[in-house]
Amino acid sequence: MSSSPSRNPTNAEAPPPPPTSTDAVAEGSSKKVRKPYTITKSRESWTEEEHDKFLEALQLFDRDWKKIEDFVGSKTVIQIRSHAQKYFLKVQKNGTLAHVPPPRPKRKAAHPYPQKASKNAQMPLQVSTSFTTTRNGDMPGYASWDDASMLLNRVISPQHELATLRGAEADIGSKGLLNVSSPSTSGMGSSSRTVSGSEIVRKAKQPPVLHGVPDFAEVYNFIGSVFDPETRGHVEKLKEMDPINFETVLLLMRNLTVNLSNPDLESTRKVLLSYDNVTTELPSVVSLVKNSTSDKSA
């Protein structure tokens, strides 16, 4: 009778040992451990003076952060960019009237970023409404209503002239200031004054009268009345105008003369010349303009 082989417990397969802590560390070392985020420096608040300098630097340098840093003087580029981002979002959310420079284009953009002026340059809020007029008696360059020498190859757009004249009406800067350059009564110089935003608010119930800004209602009412057969006394009205309105009428009448001298507007010119006022009132107005110019140049 044969005996069955004896079972030896040592020959049985042993279960794998549990992983040790050293194995876990070796496996985890293959993955990059993310460094915890810590605020190493407390956020610095901006004083009102620093914020005003920041707004002024935006007007001068747009998004040139290095120049803005030099202009502010007490903040780094990182702090300025963070402050600018929050400021731009606030302006966009509130819809306030403020200068937000366009984003800088990429390096290979077709239109590179325009070069800004230096610190010592004036802020670009200043607008000029000076009018240039000829000062000799013959007024070269100024033609009478039917002078054929005024035929030009281009037509000056009245909208362009209007946009130029209205440039001083509303551009309130970041500090609530309106800087207006106005021509002198002689038309040869200019003066500048500053209007605060609070002053504009206080006078909201009254139409603000800014020196150097023409009264466009009076100007265009006068020009329109030249073609009204029921209206007389244009010379007297022109004499009573303020110098700035007088210069504006002169500028627009010259522009109108140039446009109507274009051959494409010959039919319109003939219709206007058929009005009684154009043949009776307008020559006296033109004569007064010439005489006034001669008096100023004397």
UniProtKB/Swiss-Prot annotation:
The keyword Membrane does not apply. GO terms for biological process: circadian behavior; circadian regulation of gene expression; circadian rhythm; entrainment of circadian clock by photoperiod; photoperiodism, flowering; positive regulation of circadian rhythm; positive regulation of gene expression; positive regulation of transcription by RNA polymerase II. The keyword Transcription applies. It holds the Pfam family Myb_DNA-binding. Residues 1-44, 96-123 are annotated as: Disordered. SMART domains: SANT. GO terms for molecular function: DNA-binding transcription factor activity; sequence-specific DNA binding. Disruption phenotype: Delay and reduction in levels of evening-phased clock gene transcripts, and long circadian period. Under constant red plus blue light, extended free-running circadian period in single, double and triple mutants lacking RVE8 and either RVE4 or RVE6, or both of them. Monochromatic blue and red lights have opposite effects on the period of triple mutants rve468 lacking RVE4, RVE6 and RVE8; lack of blue light-specific increase in expression of some circadian clock genes. In long day conditions, rve468 plants have a larger size and a delayed flowering. GO terms for cellular component: nucleus. Keywords: Biological rhythms, DNA-binding, Nucleus, Transcription, Transcription regulation. Transcriptional activator of evening element (EE)-containing clock-controlled genes. Forms a negative feedback loop with APRR5. Regulates the pattern of histone H3 acetylation of the TOC1 promoter. RVE4, RVE6 and RVE8 are components of the circadian system acting synergistically to regulate flowering time, redundantly to regulate leaf growth, and antagonistically to regulate hypocotyl elongation; their action seems independent of ZTL and HY5. This is Protein REVEILLE 8. The gene is RVE8.
